[in-house]
Amino acid sequence: MPSKRTSLLIIFLTIFINMVGFGVVIPVLPFYAERFGASTWEIGWLFGIFSLVQFFASPILGQVSDRFGRRPVLLLSTLGTAAGFIIMGIGQTLTMLFVGRIIDGLSGGSIGTAQAYVADITAPEERSRAMGLIGAAFGLGFIFGPAIGGWTAAQFGYSAPMYVAGGLALINSVLIFCILPESHPKEKRQLSKKSEPLFPGLFKHVEVKPYVTVVATYFSMIAGFSIMTGVFALFVFHRYQFNAESTGYLFAMIGLIGTIIQGGMIGRLVKKYGESRLATIGALFLMLSLFWMPLTAGVAAMVLACCGIAIGNSLLSPTLTGIASRSADAEWQGRALGLMQSMGSLARWIGPVLAGWLLAYDLDKGIAAYARTPFYTAAGFLLLTFILCLRLPARLVKKPEPLA
């Protein structure tokens, strides 16, 4: 049986490979969809449909992982992701792109399940640091994923990144099948089988006020952030003439900053300042950076705004996940985090669809105003996030025991 450190490393690698596949398509998808005649509104839906389907799938997969174990859910999720990307690669119509995104979304419970896996094997006081390692895997995925996606699209065409992402997901599946042990013991699964349905049972097994607050905060953050990601590639293309390859390198820079903060600094920062204070600071960074982005008058200023976005997200995301995890009983970790990820998925659907509509509105006003309304709307969501962060508890009284 691998040690806890080894298991964390395997989860880190699993999420890293998953996020490389996810990051590969971010700078490419708008341009790939335009080849098939997609409008800005349809591009927004192409980003958003993945998350809309994931919204329904995540809590179900979280409950399945509580009852049958984390490992099989992670394995099936990554196989579904591989199938979705391959369909997007071979498809030559906009409809096939949507089919691939829907299949990928149905398989999109791996992140919440991976977070539950980490919660299974870590003590409550270690959660934010462990979630920071997940955040670092996200960051590394965003270093390599967009860069690989932009480069392969420039060299081999827009369908090539889809095959790369599908291949990486298959590698991920092999890694999980061959190496990753189960973290959720059978006796805990029996408790989950006897427990209540997700609603209202969940609220008997969490500290309701902090959990609801952190989920609402997470929803608002993701909605604002996904508005930005939905328009960013087209924004830098029209404003600064950045192509898919250049945009990929920008996302790689954001990922590098995230890796440095979440991989090497978040644990010490949490001990010194506390989770709720760090979350508040992160929300402030994100809000100001998103508001500033459409006002930038040169590449250097735009890059600085990207740095602010990266810092804010790196402080906010792992601390919110840590608070949510510690507010739930041990045998309900999968469902609590799955529901939180599901609300994030709903926000990731709303964000890009809203971004596409706002982008079309700005286009009617000319390139000079391009993407101003989407970025201001994103900043508005982060203002709400900031206000909600002020209501997060400084600490939780109840600290559920870990499962291992």
Where are these regions (language model features)?
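Multi-pass alpha-helical transporter architecture, strongest
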Residues: 173-179, 376-404
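Cytoplasmic helix-loop-helix junction between adjacent transmembrane helices
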Residues: 100-139
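Helix-to-loop junctions at the C-terminal end of transmembrane segments
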Residues: 58-69, 261-274, 359
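Short amphipathic helix-loop junctions that connect adjacent transmembrane helices
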Residues: 27-41, 230-246
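Juxtamembrane intracellular "pre-TM" segments in multi-pass secondary transporters
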Residues: 1-5, 181-216, 404
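C-terminal transmembrane helical hairpin of 12-TM major facilitator-type secondary transporters
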Residues: 276-320
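A membrane-interface helix-boundary motif in multi-pass transporters
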Residues: 154-167, 357-380
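Conserved MFS/SLC helix-loop-helix module at the cytosolic interface between two early adjacent transmembrane helices
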Residues: 55-94
